[in-house]
Amino acid sequence: MSKLDELQLNKYTKDSNCRIEYTGEKRDCVAIYLTSNNLFFPHTDEIVWKAVVEKDRYEWTKQKISYAQKHIFLRDIYKQWYASGINSTLDSIDKVVEWLKVEVKDYTRIVCLGSSGGGILQASLAQN
């Protein structure tokens, strides 16, 4: 197993690869932000380490929806169009979708942002 494979496996099994933030104000909107396959580039040990481990990088963090109360950031550290989910528990698109249904159930408006790999998961969410 390469060093890069070990790093990704460690983050996949021990990290949620999800960040949830709240505005503190009661609002009826939740926003879901899905990373693209541009989470890190090029695909090298050093770049993956800096982006995922050192910086704990999620995309869209500077473009938060201003009228959302809850912000859910997800990342696909394998850059496989979310086919392996986001971690070892939520290890498929279907499991991520079911988990998100619980996370958004108390909101009447849902905004979802994603491009590239994130767009694939966004399309799956829209169907459900």
Predicted regions and their residues:
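Hydrophobic/aromatic beta-strand patches that form the interior of the parallel beta-sheet core
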Residues: 30-32, 70-75, 111
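Alpha/beta-hydrolase active-site loop
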Residues: 83-104
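Short, surface-exposed "cap/lid" segments of acyl-processing enzymes
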Residues: 3-68, 80
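Alpha/beta-hydrolase fold nucleophile elbow
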Residues: 105-115
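Cap/lid segment of the alpha/beta-hydrolase catalytic domain
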Residues: 66-88
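Catalytic micro-motifs at enzyme active sites that drive phosphoryl/nucleotidyl and oxygen chemistry
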Residues: 60-62, 99-100, 121-124
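Catalytic phosphate/metal-binding cores of nucleic-acid and nucleotide-processing enzymes, i.e., regions
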Residues: 98-102, 111, 128
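Glycine-rich nucleophile elbow surrounding the catalytic serine of serine-hydrolase chemistry
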Residues: 114-126
